[in-house]
Design a protein with these regions (language model features):
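Exported/periplasmic ABC-transporter solute-binding proteins
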Residues: 2-7, 16, 20, 26, ...
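Acidic, polar ligand-binding/catalytic clefts
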Residues: 29-55
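Serine endopeptidase catalytic core focused on the charge-relay Asp
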Residues: 60
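Residue-level signal for tight coil/turn positions that link beta-strands
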Residues: 55-57, 86
């Protein structure tokens, strides 16, 4: 706002709901992380000029005791072990980008999404709530690293969870900005949406994002120029 004079009104929601808001002409611009679904939005004509801007990664977290013994395993192997051991796994179950990614990983691991199994618990909640529920049920969940860092900051010494799977190439998480198409949604403030998109990829903005840390940990890595 200081640089452009544009006042942003954020709606924090999962990527699936965000993309639906774009199709319903309820927003001017989207910042989302489900590439396949994003490309469908652009192909449908509701999204334009998609730009990749930053990335972080997903991780699998679980109890410090790690009852399923998946620490250090690859993503697919870890999910197979969790399934075979029937350890509790908490899923957002909310059609968010994280949920979409998790489902794709279950398909890679077992060809079948374990939605009817008692150990597979769908919360229908956001990420922080889902991590908290996983801790309560001595279970595992998949989260983005940024939310995990926030969770660590909130819990401090009371944190009963730890990262068990990370830095697997299957866990990459790309964020993109997509203005909504004025031709489909006449009330869209396209100039302001485009201004925000252009601002996100500016070198100065990219540097600011890369330098921003919580608990001395980087939340997002800029990659608009890559």
């Amino acid at each position: 706002e200081k640089e452009t004079g544009t006042n942003l009104k954020w709606v924090a929601t999962g990527t699936g709901k965000a993309l639906k808001m774009g199709e319903n002409c309820d927003v001017d611009v989207l910042l989302v992380h489900a590439p396949a679904a994003e490309k469908k939005l652009v192909e449908s004509g509701f999204g334009i000029d998609r730009k990749e801007v930053v990335y972080n990664d997903f991780i699998i977290v679980g109890p410090i005791a790690d009852p399923a013994h998946v620490s250090g395993k690859g993503t697919v192997e870890a999910l197979k072990i969790i399934k075979d051991s029937k350890a509790n796994f908490l899923s957002r179950g909310d059609d968010s980008g994280t949920h979409k990614k998790e489902l794709s990983l279950w398909k890679d691991a077992s060809q079948v999404i374990p939605e009817t199994d008692l150990w597979y618990i769908q919360t229908g909640q956001g990420m922080l709530t889902t991590i908290n529920m996983a801790a309560e049920k001595n279970g595992y969940t998949m989260t983005d690293r940024g939310t995990w860092i926030k969770y660590e900051a909130q819990k401090g010494a009371d944190n009963k969870m730890k990262i068990v799977v990370e830095k697997d190439k299957t866990l990459f998480k790309q964020y993109s900005v997509i203005p909504v198409n004025k031709a489909k949604c006449p009330n869209v403030k396209l100039e302001l949406a485009q201004s925000f998109s252009d601002w996100l990829i500016k070198p100065e903005t990219q540097k600011f994002i890369g330098d921003f840390k919580l608990l001395d940990k980087t939340l997002f890595t800029p990659n608009a120029s890559k």
